[in-house]
């Protein structure tokens, strides 16, 4: 067995010892909203980031009028890696959040505070980073954890849901019998971008009669308008970031 | 070593954990009795027992890092890390981690695979436990150990929910202790 060191294609901000704050927090109604020209990773059109007030209406953040002091620490613990997995994408790396014991604890606590005592019996988490946040939340609120996986990973009988990618389609699966009709669920993932994966997860659970109370993510990329794909289902996020 | 041989003999929690694990025959191929832990995750009490047993064992051992092997190690590792105040480090398949990585290859039945970890995630002399759902040959865990030791970390123990018969009687994996909660269910007719 050999130990090999591999460098990424591009990586400007590799501070693991100290988290680099790269996320913009859109949560203060009283500050003048920032107008920022950003490049969308899908096209060369520059988008104007919408105002913080509008952002708050579109999807709820953990900060209503006053920012929860835990949010800033969580946001600053997330590392941004430019041009991963391909040029133009600013990848939101939550592995650095997991190295910050206070930030990780606070992340879970914020979700648990929101969802405990709401009659939620199912926490569904999307492979693989949803597996990191989902189970601690499920354990704390007394719910089951249901993994939603890529094809052929789950060993038992499954139901599948296909969804669109930029090029082609992908599929997520869930075990038959994992959930029962009438159960109340939340769906967890680390990040919502276009919303395709979460929308597929919603469809999968609704097909078996589950009520999705909310989708919850650590990070949202609002310019990608993922929330629109979720239909009637509300979205709760801790941090919003530029795509 | 199995938990029952190490202070937890007769602990009813181990029986509940074992009973909650579903066996799926002939997955991913004929002859394999797959140990499906997704049913353990559906049983809140049994899942909590699983985490509690690991937490009780490691909370006073000055462990600062829990490393979990993708993807089923992710289901157990973070909860343990949170409870003992340790960092969680995901060990992933190639190409998934976005930053600078180190990589270790390991043998499969046919061919080989690779495991990666972010450079800088662990610091020299940190005390680490490695978590996975199941240990069979120990190949994946050995690769995980190599990654962590190459960065100067001390692997204190490897811990798994299920241990296949190959590891029974072996208290160590590559010289490091191995701690396992239960044996596989449904193997009687094969032994």
Swiss-Prot record, chain A:
Entry's Gene Ontology BP terms: adenine salvage; AMP salvage; cytokinin metabolic process; purine ribonucleoside salvage
Transit peptide range is: 1-52
> Null phenotype?
Male sterility due to pollen abortion after meiosis. Accumulation of free bases of cytokinins and enhanced resistance to exogenous cytokinins.
CDD domains linked to this entry: PRTases_typeI
Q: Which organism is it from?
A: Arabidopsis thaliana
Q: Which cysteines are joined by disulfide bonds?
A: none
Write down what this protein is called: Adenine phosphoribosyltransferase 1, chloroplastic
Q: What is the effect of changing residue 168 to E?
A: In apt1-4; reduces activity 3-fold
Q: Which UniProt keywords apply?
A: Acetylation, Chloroplast, Cytoplasm, Glycosyltransferase, Plastid, Purine salvage, Transferase, Transit peptide
Describe the effect of residue 195 to D. In apt1-8; loss of activity and male sterility
What catalytic activity is recorded? AMP + diphosphate = 5-phospho-alpha-D-ribose 1-diphosphate + adenine
Q: What does this protein do?
A: Catalyzes a salvage reaction resulting in the formation of AMP, that is energically less costly than de novo synthesis. Contributes primarily to the recycling of adenine into adenylate nucleotides, but is also involved in the inactivation of cytokinins by phosphoribosylation. Catalyzes the conversion of cytokinins from free bases (active form) to the corresponding nucleotides (inactive form).
Reading the lineage from the top rank, the first entry is Eukaryota
Q: What's a Pfam family in this record?
A: Pribosyltran
Known outcome of mutating residue 196 to R = In apt1-9; loss of activity and male sterility
EC number(s) for this protein? 2.4.2.7
From Swiss-Prot, chain B:
Q: What happens when the gene is disrupted?
A: No visible phenotype under normal growth conditions.
**Pfam families linked to this entry:** Pribosyltran
Compartments (UniProt record): Cytoplasm
- The EC designation for this entry is 2.4.2.7
Q: In which pathway does it act?
A: Purine metabolism; AMP biosynthesis via salvage pathway; AMP from adenine: step 1/1
Q: Chief localization class?
A: cytoplasm
- An example of a Gene Ontology BP annotation on this entry? adenine salvage
Q: Which UniProt keywords apply?
A: Cytoplasm, Glycosyltransferase, Purine salvage, Transferase
Matching entries from InterPro entries are given as: Ade_phspho_trans, Adenine_PRTase, PRibTrfase_dom, PRTase-like
Give the main EC class. transferase
Give a GO molecular function annotation for the protein: adenine phosphoribosyltransferase activity
Record carries keyword tRNA processing: no
> Which PROSITE patterns is this protein grouped with?
PUR_PYR_PR_TRANSFER
Q: How does it assemble?
A: Homodimer.
> Record's NCBIfam families?
apt, PRK02304.1-3, PRK02304.1-5
Protein name in UniProt: Adenine phosphoribosyltransferase 5
Q: What is the lineage of its organism?
A: Eukaryota, Viridiplantae, Streptophyta, Embryophyta, Tracheophyta
